[in-house]
């Protein structure tokens, strides 16, 4: 198994800070998301899957990052969104339907984000379905360790199901219905900064059909996720060149439009030094 890069360790610290702060504000005292994070952070099987997914994506297929940094960045994005929505009084689907807690939603979203691209160990086409197949037993094992009592069978089932929905739905190829899964979809689309395209661009290769994704992503300087002005969430995409609009219009917006959380956010994008364009 590869050693962790400085970037991966930096993202891990951000996740630690985010999940700790989110759960510190809860009166229930439920620390399941924090216990989950320390389990997943040190899970060698998950680390191996994430590392090999990147080997296949970058080395074999010539695509951008689909490995540990990407999956953990998606987790960061999702936690930021959950925190902002929760602070704004927006309930998750589990909360609204009175079948789960906020901690359950956070747990499911973390599981989904950290495993959503595990199917890239097999290939690009249909990888969201392969991710579901690969992730199911891992999720079941982890939840059984953290919630071992028989009285938790329903809770484990609900968390696992929401996580699976987020994993299988992250490409917008399959309908999803929960806010939690919708957050995964958008969080995945928000990982589009130039760092994600850096390694593939440094590898000599002949021009291919998917190059626009690498070059457009390389123009994205920053993605901001913050509290919105007239909606709870605001996403701002800052870029150095107009080619970055491809990422916004062809990758992120279709994911937002397929998300049950689409009415909860504003989307802005623009070239640095110019006026921002509001899309949503």
Task: List the predicted regions and their residue ranges.
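An N-terminal, globular interaction/scaffold subdomain
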Residues: 45-51, 63-68, 72
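Histidine- and acidic-residue-rich, metal-dependent catalytic cores
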Residues: 71, 75-82, 109, 128-173, ...
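Active-site-adjacent bridging/hinge elements
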Residues: 44-55, 104-112
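General structural signal for secondary-structure boundaries
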Residues: 67, 100-105, 152-155
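Short N-terminal signal/transit or membrane-insertion segments
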Residues: 27-52, 150-170
């Amino acid at each position: 198994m590869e050693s962790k890069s400085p970037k991966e360790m930096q993202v891990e610290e951000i996740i630690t800070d985010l999940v700790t702060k989110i759960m510190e504000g809860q009166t229930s005292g439920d620390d399941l998301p924090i216990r989950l994070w320390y389990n997943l952070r040190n899970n060698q099987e998950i680390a191996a899957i994430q590392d090999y997914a990147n080997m296949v994506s970058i080395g074999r297929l010539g695509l951008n990052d689909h490995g540990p940094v990407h999956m953990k960045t998606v987790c960061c994005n999702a936690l930021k969104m959950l925190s902002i929505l929760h602070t704004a009084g927006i309930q998750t689907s589990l909360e609204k339907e009175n079948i789960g807690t906020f901690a359950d939603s956070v747990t499911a979203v973390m599981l989904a984000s950290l495993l959503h691209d595990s199917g890239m160990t097999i290939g690009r086409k249909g990888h969201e379905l392969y991710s579901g197949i690969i992730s199911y037993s891992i999720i079941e094992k982890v939840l059984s360790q953290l919630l071992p009592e028989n009285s938790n069978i329903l809770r484990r089932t609900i968390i696992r199901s929401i996580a699976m929905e987020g994993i299988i739905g992250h490409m917008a190829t399959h309908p999803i219905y929960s806010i939690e899964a919708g957050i995964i979809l958008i969080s995945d689309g928000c990982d589009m900064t130039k760092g994600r395209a850096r390694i593939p661009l440094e590898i000599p290769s002949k021009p291919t059909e998917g190059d626009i994704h690498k070059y457009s992503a390389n123009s994205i300087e920053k993605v901001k996720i913050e509290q919105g002005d007239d909606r709870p969430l605001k996403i701002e995409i800052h870029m150095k060149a107009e080619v970055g609009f491809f990422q916004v219009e062809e990758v992120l917006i279709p994911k937002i439009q397929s998300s049950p959380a689409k009415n909860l956010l504003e989307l802005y994008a623009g070239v640095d030094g110019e006026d921002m364009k509001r899309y949503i």
